[in-house]
Amino acid sequence: MNMNQTTSPALSQVETAIRVPAGNFAKYNYYSVFDIVRQTRKQFINANMSWPGSRGGKAWDLAMGQAQYIRCMFRENQLTRRVRGTLQQTPDNGTNLSSSAVGGIQGQAERRPDLATLMVVNDAINQQIPTLLPYHFPHDQVELSLLNTDVSLEDIISESSIDWPWFLSNSLTGDNSNYAMELASRLSPEQQTLPTEPDNSTATDLTSFYQTNLGLKTADYTPFEALNTFARQLAITVPPGGTVDCGYSACQPAV
């Protein structure tokens, strides 16, 4: 800059704030607030003790505030120009979009008809329900910890147990061999009960079967022919107009 340059508006505000004559900074080669903040606060005060005196610190603080504001405005304008330039490259405002698929859109009332009956309570909002049931938290944590490794829990146990494996011969069956197979299955304890629970679907009296699996004491499947009853006992939501096959093949246990 040269002496013919005028003081910037931001620096003029600093002059007004500290009550010095207009253009006084320019006499000392300060034409903008950036000329001031190029120096540290201490350097500026020491270099200008003769004329602003005790107001030098306040002048530097005001100049720093103005400089920060100008930087923010400059960056904001840059970002605005970039966004506008990007939008101009995609001038389509939606008028060219096809409306042929609008008729096939399912509204929220169809997708979640149960929303209208839900209560806004703490359990409904904050209760965490696993997406895969039955769920076992400790087993899930172990599986997650081994997710990015090349070894399974069975492999880790086999390397650390001196009597592994227990199921090499028929004579080594028992609790230990069952434990080994449980580890190898990679199923949680709740999942392991599904294939090992007693089969109660082949009895002559199926009351116990329906009581255990569908929560209704009945000797046959006829109560579940009513869709509302079937959906309620399974805790499922049926969309409006939906149907569930509740004939013999759906509700009667396979023999």
Curated annotation (Swiss-Prot):
It comes from the Bacteria. The keyword Lyase does not apply. The keyword RNA-binding does not apply. InterPro entries: Insecticidal_toxin/plasmid_vir, Sal_SpvA. Keywords: Plasmid, Virulence. Belongs to the SpvA family. NCBIfam families: PRK15212.1. Not known. This protein is involved in the virulence of salmonellas. This is 28.1 kDa virulence protein. It comes from Salmonella choleraesuis (strain SC-B67). The lineage of its organism: Bacteria, Pseudomonadati, Pseudomonadota, Gammaproteobacteria, Enterobacterales. The gene is spvA.
